[in-house]
Amino acid sequence: TLAAMRGVKAEGGWGVVNTEYCSIHPSSDDVPHPFASLWDEGDVRNMAAMADAVHEHGSLAGTELWYGGIRSSNHHSREVALAPSSFPAAESPWQCAKMDLDDIRTFRGWHRAAALRAKQADLDIVYVYAAHTYILNQFLDRDMNTRTDEYGGTLMQRARLLREVLSETRNAIGDRCGIALRIEVDNEDGGGFEERSELLAALAPMVDLFDVTIADYSQEMGGSRFIKEGSLEPSIAHVRKITGKPVVSVGRFTSPETMLSQVKSGIVDLIGAARPSIADPFLPLKIAEGREDDIRECIGCNICVTHDYTMTPLRCTQNPSMGEEWRRGWHPEMIRPKEEDKHILVVGAGPAGLEAARALGQRGYQVTIADKASEAGGRVARESRLPGLSAWGRVRDWRLLQLNKLPNVSLYLESEMTPETVAELGADHILVTTGSEWLRDLTGRHTLAPFHHPQGCDVLTPDDLMAGRRPKARDVVLFDDDHYYRG
């Protein structure tokens, strides 16, 4: 599944396609998260399948070698995680073991073996991962690394293990693969930019590419409501100058103009784009072909991040083919043509109706889409008017743009469909995509029985608020049993 998904990204023009973090040893497992691993020969075969799928389209393939340390729950392997100091393991009722010098030598051997397996799998870029509070960054952090031996002390002393790992990775893979270092430009407390800059400069001769970020993960991975495109720029702008090496970074880039500006201004040499590549795997190719209007832009809703946190296969609001490339044979740009002429009626022009009409129209069917509202988009049209959520309107806007290019699709607004009008139209197939609405009886995830509120109590749902209704009383109780984003 992952090989097919990454192969599609390579087909779409991405220059480098990476795995997410890739475990190097069973004492750092993240099951049931759907992560990668390079523990043994079986993993090499799996990784080689991904590399082959990426290479088929001329892109480079890479992996991020990962050891979680205190971030390793090890629910599957039941191994004891190792860390610079003994801390509770992530979301688990047990401790990590403080690494002695033998443990450190053993860890270095695990990392070197994983680098060799990455080379064996024909990968082009091998990441040394020293960010996001994983093991190498735990050694760098003064609060997590309280050691008094040669692996503790000043930042340069705490960086000893990182330097050893970089050197041994180069020794293992030679010039066959590039070495990328994923590292934060600040300390976990948000300070330390000056000493971190000295560290980056010192590490530069050992690194081919710097992949830089900051300690505040909410800035890197925040949703569009609170975190704007290119938010890391002020923090990382100095790295290229002080290291003299190519730099890549992320920032939920969706605008080609912003990407170009980052490169032209010398902030980065390469654009890192996880979420944008999920929303539109063909984004680079569309830029190259001058089809920027066809880019299916990420809306920053973070449904992809949610599925990562809930340990379930990846999904995307904008791209329904994501994760289904192998299982169902879906492709973000191509769809099987119709087998016979049919007229299809789609009732409801919300996100589901617009997507259904677009897909059916692309297949060549005659499609009529009708909605009683005066504007298309359904709920997302109202949501996108809420403060900070304008980007969500891209769900509607992109689909309307695509529908306008299909002469076989007709959209009718202010057209309520009744059984009589449906029968009169005489369509061969009817799709009802009228969506859903919030209940007023307060039933939800935990409140399973209807709640009988006091007489005279004005109960408003999110639908009411988005439609402009407001509470009549001064005192308001916010009741959230949805546990998602509404509250």
Predicted regions and their residues:
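Glycine-rich dinucleotide-binding loop and its adjacent helix/turn
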Residues: 324-333, 337, 402-405, 411, ...
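Glycine-/small-residue-rich beta->alpha transition segments that form the dinucleotide
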Residues: 427-429, 433-443
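Beta1-alpha1 glycine-rich phosphate/pyrophosphate-binding loop at the start
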Residues: 210, 346-410, 481-487
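Glycine-rich, anion-gripping cofactor-binding loops and their flanking helix/strand elements
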Residues: 224-236, 241, 384-397, 405, ...
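Flavin-dependent oxidoreductase catalytic cores
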Residues: 1-347, 351, 355-367, 375, ...
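NAD(P)H/NAD(P)+-dependent Rossmann-fold oxidoreductase cores
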Residues: 389-390, 404, 420-421, 434-435
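Short acidic loop-to-helix transition motifs that present clustered carboxylates
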Residues: 254-257, 278, 416-419, 465-468
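A conserved short coil-to-beta-strand element within the FAD-binding core of flavoproteins
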Residues: 412-425
